[in-house]
């Protein structure tokens, strides 16, 4: 049996982090967590691209452009969509989730969903480092692991093996 899995070595990986300015009280903490996680695991500053966008819906356009560039080993999408009094929360939360899933199905680059969808600001802050850990840090760990898994899958299954059957 062959088991293939990623690891947490970030040396040499190129990671993009897409983060909205909307709900900056939360998203800035998510970004801090993501950058901390990436750097602690060896991703160098010059290999991290932070893309600031107005809000979470703009991540869809930004993801497409970053994927078209083809230079990143993984992309992290951060954000904080907090329920309000209107249906807007549902639209944004659903569309960004669907878009990330769709890009993951159609792209060779792993995209990590680090968008908080909460009922209250307090819940969002708790998940951005207050009580429930930092989901930005967790997203960074997933990005590193998936970028390495991508490389291992390519190496193990796409590159020709010298002792493979002809």
UniProtKB/Swiss-Prot annotation:
Example of a GO MF term: 6,7-dimethyl-8-ribityllumazine synthase activity
Pathway in which this enzyme or protein is active: Cofactor biosynthesis; riboflavin biosynthesis; riboflavin from 2-hydroxy-3-oxobutyl phosphate and 5-amino-6-(D-ribitylamino)uracil: step 1/2
Reaction(s) catalysed (UniProt annotation): (2S)-2-hydroxy-3-oxobutyl phosphate + 5-amino-6-(D-ribitylamino)uracil = 6,7-dimethyl-8-(1-D-ribityl)lumazine + phosphate + 2 H2O + H(+)
Hydrolase keyword on record: no
EC number: 2.5.1.78
InterPro entries according to UniProt: LS (IPR034964), LS/RS (IPR002180), LS/RS_sf (IPR036467)
Binding site residues for (2S)-2-hydroxy-3-oxobutyl phosphate: 85-86, 127
List of residues binding 5-amino-6-(D-ribitylamino)uracil: 22, 56-58, 80-82, 113
CDD domains: Lumazine_synthase-I
A GO term from the CC aspect: cytosol
Residues annotated as the enzyme's active site: 88 (proton donor)
Keywords: Riboflavin biosynthesis, Transferase
GO BP terms in the entry: riboflavin biosynthetic process
Function (record text): Catalyzes the formation of 6,7-dimethyl-8-ribityllumazine by condensation of 5-amino-6-(D-ribitylamino)uracil with 3,4-dihydroxy-2-butanone 4-phosphate. This is the penultimate step in the biosynthesis of riboflavin.
Family to which the UniProt record says this protein belongs: Belongs to the DMRL synthase family.
Name listed for the protein in its UniProt record: 6,7-dimethyl-8-ribityllumazine synthase
Taxonomic source organism: Thermotoga neapolitana (strain ATCC 49049 / DSM 4359 / NBRC 107923 / NS-E)
